[in-house]
Amino acid sequence: MSTTKLTYSSGSSAKSKHSVRVAQTTADAKLHAVYEESGESGDSFDYSKSINATKSTGETIPAQAVTAYLQRMQRGGLVQPFGCMLAVEEGSFRVIAFSDNAGEMLDLMPQSVPSLGSGQQDVLTIGTDARTLFTAAASALEKAAGAVDLSMLNPIWVQSKTSAKPFYAIVHRIDVGLVMDLEPVKASDTRVGSAAGALQSHKLAAKAISRLQSLPGGDIGLLCDTVVEEVRDVTGYDLVMAYKFHEDEHGEVVAEIRRSDLEPYLGLHYPATDIPQASRFLFMKNRVRMICDCSAPPVKITQDKELRQPISLAGSTLRAPHGCHAQYMGNMGSVASLVMAMIINDNDEPSGGGGGGGQHKGRRLWGLVVCHHTSPRSVPFLRSACEFLMQVFGLQLNMEAAVAAHVREKHILRTQTLLCDMLLRDAPIGIVSQSPNIMDLVKCDGAALYYGKRFWLLGITPSEAQIKDIAEWLLEHHKDSTGLSTDSLADAGYPGAASLGDEVCGMAAAKITAKDFLFWFRSHTAKEVKWGGAKHDPDDKDDGRKMHPRSSFKAFLEVVKRRSLPWEDVEMDAIHSLQLILRGSFQDIDDSDTKTMIHARLNDLKLQGMDELSTVANEMVRLIETATAPILAVDSSGFINGWNAKVADVTGLPVTEAMGRSLAKELVLHESADMVERLLYLALQGDEEQNVELKLKTFGGQKDKEAVILVVNACASRDVSDNVVGVCFVGQDVTGQKVVMDKFTRIQGDYKAIVQNPNPLIPPIFGADEFGYCSEWNPAMEKLSGWRREEVLGKMLVGEIFGIQMMYCRLKGQDAVTKFMIVLNSAADGQDTEKFPFAFFDRQGKYVEALLTATKRADAEGSITGVFCFLHIASAELQQALTVQRATEKVALSKLKELAYIRQEIKNPLYGIMFTRTLMETTDLSEDQKQYVETGAVCEKQIRKILDDMDLESIEDGYLELDTTEFMMGTVMDAVISQGMITSKEKNLQLIRETPKEIKAMFLYGDQVRLQQVLADFLLNAIRFTPSSENWVGIKVATSRKRLGGVVHVMHLEFRITHPGVGLPEELVQEMFDRGRGMTQEGLGLSMCRKLVKLMNGEVEYIREAGKNYFLVSLELPLAQRDDAGSVKFQASS
């Protein structure tokens, strides 16, 4: 599937991916239709040719045919015979569908034999109460049916009422009720007994999970190799492979472990049609898919005739394989398979999706782990362990993605430096004639500059004549775009693509002037592909006709023969950055002035950046000194150079006595000394540890305490050259909670005296039994969560109490659930976890942050009977500490990067406006025209000021520095009115202004730009929420004079912005005063403006009266007076 884009914004990637999936779903449906027709006509199905035919033909397939194909994939009406299926109405358990083998597997009488005797029903028909088919253990089914998240309760152990035969019931919800997949329990699994459920099965993957978590970061290949090894150890399949899906939806085998006599597939690439989009959607719904015997005839489903469509089997573990897939498995010698989805986070993913490719919001299918076996095989209970293993694998992949994002960020910073370095040379020729050059920006085989009808070529490129032809084609067919990227010039419609051959297939083009371009070129993908599999005989005529991995590889090579590797978003962002700088810097600028202009801009940005760093540093010092969390800092040798008031208070050691002392040798207990040395060593290497426990010595008035126990985060301190010069420790005092918890974990008798004690020193405690059901919920946990003990006891801790759906205590996402499950499983296996970051939403929807410690619970014999969890509350102190930590040098540097980019992009057109205004000021203007120009100037100044507001926290926290300059009130009012004119005219509203002449001519001291910013925002909101039928909006200014100390006069200003109608929505007013539950864009603007007024020692009210509403802004500003010489002074009293 070719990808061609006319824009370079990575924000468009989600839309592009969605389009690719929709197109691929159509191709899947066409290929399936060809396969079905070949079966009906008796013709053999040539897989390779069919794939190419669906790609090359221009025929479209009706939407109804695509829908029918998707319906057949999900509602095929067939199940595998190794188990049986029941579908029931939720609540009543009335059977609405069953597989035709259900009666036999459950040892029920045939339907044709009438039920005799007491009316007890021993037959299976539509309408049967499914609960009557099982023993009393069926109560577990009823309990599961009431759960929001059924997955944590699966598999459920049940027994046939007739024969006591045990089954695993895997239950899930569908549109018309519940589906129960019943799989017979193997003799080897009878040791599990009724102790089924996810928590029990997860123990089977404990070793594999431990190994995954112990792997070093930065090596996805090693991660995949380890996963396939562990899956084979757990499941025993002959062949285990890890598939990765690429951006263009095709797949690649990236890891493999196999029986020595089986054919290798490592390195195999296969076309996207090998795993249809509909199948990928099903993997998102049902993450583990088992085929016990692909050659076994499937079993039909009988269902209630009242149902409008066939039962959905999208989430069923028994869904039968489609004929083409069974044939594919047979051709590769596989009889049984187990496929597990590898799902990761993806912020670019939209929710839902067209065709079969829709995916869950924020999640995407990264790849699959596929197991094959040469004989029939099923692993019922192990499947849940494998699914959990895949969740942990996804978590590790997400961590690797975070590392990759960090590397990408460094790459972007390096690229921006490289771009600026290029611009300091002869522009634009230096970016292709010197080293580094534009080929160093992105991975490519060649690059070219077409500038002023001249050519500069690097690497493998088209000829000069061909490049000129491509440029003319772009100008003619893509004249409205600023460039184009494609992995196939042929598919993009370039008529001369065939003449370029395989050497030039993909292209990224960036327009730098009206007729000049930068080009990057890539050769065909096939030269990048290496397959370690068996070489097939080219004379084997049947090789391409079979559905087999070799034919898939052959088809893939055919598909990508004239296509390059796709261009990644990060590469296009780098190209786009260069394009923006070149377009803004060189278009219509004389070469002789280029260096001067660039040096001036770079120096301007550098000075601004240093000022911002200085501001951040000053605020950091203030925050640290006044923080209510204990904060200390050491230099690179480990000597104290920071000791705030809180840590001095809890230790009893004044700051004057702490400064200069060794933290490791003098201030911590001996048992923490090694940890301090380790933290210091790691931080100096740039590795910052979190949630580490330190025990500080006590002094003076605190000497009676044994120690002060802090949980700290280490943060490296850096100088302006980015060198690490020390370490800052931001901590939380957990001394009281730690003492209580230590006593609790050592207690040998009845623990309830401590757990149920309402003493505030007792931390929140909850627990689970060995099956995962909540067994403890103490008063502190009741208070913290808002849920009473009797409401949660006996419910599944994960899935019913903590989860991501409508749970009692909702977690933020699937990753949070997986991490919590890992902690619980580790504790149940005897491995305690301390200070694990844990957060959930309480009963009122408040987000609670804490540190969790999980420990095993054992009986008198030492057998593990469950898990206890203790929470260290993320107090206001910790919250403030985290805020301080976030405001470190990393934030400052990040801010500099953002400012440099945004200013470059937005200030360029602003410079154009300023230049135009400057030209106008040199011409003969009337008084009105001069006023218009002056109004434009103060509006420009307002834009520049807003562009500088990168850190809204400084406004929210009240420490933004305001400018104090002399200004004329009339100029402010002109600027405010001008910003409301266009919107008011669009709504046919008259803007009524009441500003007395003496106020217009009044000179005041204050922050003119901030004043006009807030007044304009209030005015525009008034206009926005005034119906056109009301005809008017008004702004009125009233003043009164006050005298301070007999010297300075202060003007009390009252601005009343009035509008008729119902007024602003109440939710928006609440947001303005920070009382709303959320924050819209308009609410954020109003809130910031209210805080700016407060910074100016003013107040804002929003008042509703009969038929009208108004903003009332009150503030006081010093009055200025001009003398005859034009200088300004404060107006003194007469």
UniProtKB/Swiss-Prot annotation:
The keyword RNA-binding does not apply. It comes from the Eukaryota. InterPro entries: GAF, GAF-like_dom_sf, HATPase_C_sf, His_kinase_dom, HisK_dim/P_dom, PAS, PAS-assoc_C, PAS-like_dom_sf. Coiled coil: none annotated. Residues 219-401 form the GAF domain. SUPFAM superfamilies: ATPase domain of HSP90 chaperone/DNA topoisomerase II/histidine kinase (SSF55874), GAF domain-like (SSF55781), PYP-like sensor domain (PAS domain) (SSF55785). One of its GO terms (biological process) is detection of visible light. Regulatory photoreceptor which exists in two forms that are reversibly interconvertible by light: the Pr form that absorbs maximally in the red region of the spectrum and the Pfr form that absorbs maximally in the far-red region. Photoconversion of Pr to Pfr induces an array of morphogenic responses, whereas reconversion of Pfr to Pr cancels the induction of those responses. Pfr controls the expression of a number of nuclear genes including those encoding the small subunit of ribulose-bisphosphate carboxylase, chlorophyll A/B binding protein, protochlorophyllide reductase, rRNA, etc. This is Phytochrome 1. It comes from Selaginella martensii.
